[in-house]
Amino acid sequence: MKLKMKAKTILLTGALSTVFAASAFAAPLHPVVHNDWMQQKKIINGFDQGGLLLERSVSLGEAVALIARGTGAEVAQPQGYWATNYLTWAYSKGAITKDEKANDRSFPAADRLTAIAKKLGLELQLPAGEQVTRGDFVQALGDALTEHVTIAHTNDVHGHIQENSKDKEFGYAKIATLVKEWREENKNFLLMDAGDTFQGTIYTNQFKGESILPILNSLGYGAMAAGNHEFDFGYEQLLKLRDQLKYPMINANVYKADGTNLLVPTYTTEVGGQKIAFIGFVTEETPIVTHPNNVIGLTFKDPVDIAKKLVPEMKEKADRVFILSHIGVEKDREIAKNVSGIDLIIGGHSHTPLRTPEVVNGTYIVQDWEYGKSLGRVDLYYYNKDLVGFSGGLVEYDESVKADPEIDKLVQEVVKKVDTAMGAVIGKTEVDLHGERGEVRAVETNLGNFIADAIIAKTKTIKGHEADVALVNGGGIRASKKAGDLTKKDLYSILPFPNTLTIVKATGADIKAALEVSVKGVEKKDDLPGSFLQIGGMSYVYDVTKPVGERVLEVKVGGQPIDPAKTYTVATNDFITSGGDGYSMLKKDEVLNTGYTFYDVVEEYLQNVKVINPKVENRIVEKK
């Protein structure tokens, strides 16, 4: 069968990578070696003495034969010398001269091979030189024979719109630069998002996600999957956001009360000669991790069950089926294991930096990281509509990437808009709130108690994850506040970090061990560590004169002595449950990351209660 070849026009000088020398971030992250699939397709054969001998120079006869096989030319099997019919075919096309036909064991230079290939229907990129190795020729031929599709992908950006060099986050302006480079490099390009985009920082939350619509609409996304946190402002607001996007928001496993899909379930596009269908999924735990009022009347079904039904249907309508999922890598693996026919799953939700793609049951699984710390890239190579090559990974934060001026302007407009909105009053405190460094890192404070209590109150709305205790690292509390009105800006100065509320199961022994870490440096008056914990739902007594690790004398949870063997539900933040500040005992395999920042939680609590008057209640007592 005759193939329609794509144009390849540049004869390179030096290595292939020099085409994109202007950027260190262009080109596939892991170049695909074409000789593997070309050998499987019997385009290239080994020698009798074994091996492909790719280091040898390619002869005229070999080059013509490889082109003929690769392009599907109708060349009769030779009866005598193996190259005769290939040479006759090339001569009939005007690609080689009569003298060349008679001297197939010559070794043409790169420019001559390029001219021959062009006459035979395709153009090659070859390193310039008097001779070309078999390896270089096969690689160039593979590039010309395949349709190369590049996909950039993001997930769980959570409103981190600005560059943050301290936490190594690109921000959208620098992501835009990478996207533009990749799009210019390969016309067969898609940018996709796997959800949790509109919620997470003050820059998104203050306007229920609408503030960043101009940024997203300027980046050129193809489609996005709805993440669980897209529901945090209520599903009606989700639909409002969807309607203002210039690209579709897809989901196939959320249903309205009348049995119809809440969102369009799929997105189909043609790129690189492939008709690709994307199916969107969100975690079925969404009704647990968002407020129940946000999803009233909605049903969240198991993505595996939906995939079993929908993938075969989409394969009838498209060449390839991809999944755009916000269900976490474990569930992605489950889909791949149980449903055949999926080329690629672009995932999110579990914040898993898949630097190396996974392969399960023939399905590639990728996931970008979180908060714009990286940009995912996938390169797929198709031959005769078969996937024959794959490369994937992450381009992680690099300060040297330049910010795109257009997107940077849009980002700064959002920042300015939010700064103006931060003057709004959200509550009132009848007492001074004590959050100075020397207090929150050394003793119980009324502000620490207020924050811990707000966190416990929030968990009471998350069915099955109601916390017994709350642990707040003092280093995360950054300011005090005089009695009076509390504005958004006041609260943000107290809780400026985007740490999110996490919930974990821990034994009484784990909790006591955490308290030992909390008080291990409490006597360091001039260098107090931020690991000191403000607490809720519990109390304890410690003795600073005791050795480190033996200072906690008495612990009570809910007024009762702690049971070392009992499992308790602990609410804290993602920094602590990742083992930060030495809290390795709280780094568990199963952690619920709610996605709510401490700022979000405390603001909501304050808006509900309106007036606060927190006190010190002997939750933390030093034995004198």
PLM regions and their residue ranges:
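Generic alpha-helical secondary-structure signal
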Residues: L66, A115, A140, L178, ...
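Acidic/histidine-rich, surface-exposed loop or edge segments in extracytoplasmic proteins
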Residues: I67-T71, A152-E163, I426-G438, S493, ...
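Hard-cation-handling environments
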Residues: P405-L486
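Acidic, metal/ion-coordinating pockets
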Residues: T146-K402, K409, A442-A457, K463-A470, ...
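N-terminal propeptides
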Residues: M1-T146
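Feature captures C-terminal
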Residues: T88, T150, H160, F170, ...
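Acidic helix-start/capping segments at beta-turn-to-alpha-helix junctions
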Residues: G80-W89, A194-Q199, G474, R478
